[in-house]
Amino acid sequence: KSRSIKRTLVIFLVVIAGLYLAACIMLYFAQRSMLYFPTSRADSFPSISIESEGEKIQVLTKISDSTDAIVLFGGNADDVSNYHGDFANTFPKKDIFLVNYRGYGGSTGTPTESALFADALAVYDHVHERYQNIT
């Protein structure tokens, strides 16, 4: 009887470990879709496209005669068009560049950490050509 209980316990633990391993594997392969889920665009605003590593990065803008600029990347699964009106009203004397991550708000490609760094440098270089002060 003791052997039967041990055997049942071992089988139970192996099944639990197998289910846990299967869940971990499923989460690993599904992590991109769980972390990066695009939201819909709030409205249409003036925009420019900046090329980065062969992808087009969509940047919403509010451009005037200012020498100061604000560059903003949205949060996780965020479309920056939601902030356009707020930033334009809050900072009327600054030009605004709201950057959509790859795969969001009209930007092409897939979001990754290395892509984010490359895109940030491409956007900064583009904005720095005209503006002295970038926030």
Task: Label every model-predicted segment.
Residues 1-49:
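N-terminal membrane-anchoring alpha-helices
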Residues 27, 41-44, 51, 65, ...:
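A generic structural signal for short, solvent-exposed coil/turn residues
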Residues 52-56:
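Glycine-centered tight beta-turn/hairpin loop motif at sheet-sheet or coil-to-beta transitions
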Residues 57-130:
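Membrane-embedded segments
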Residues 131-135:
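Alpha/beta-hydrolase fold nucleophile elbow
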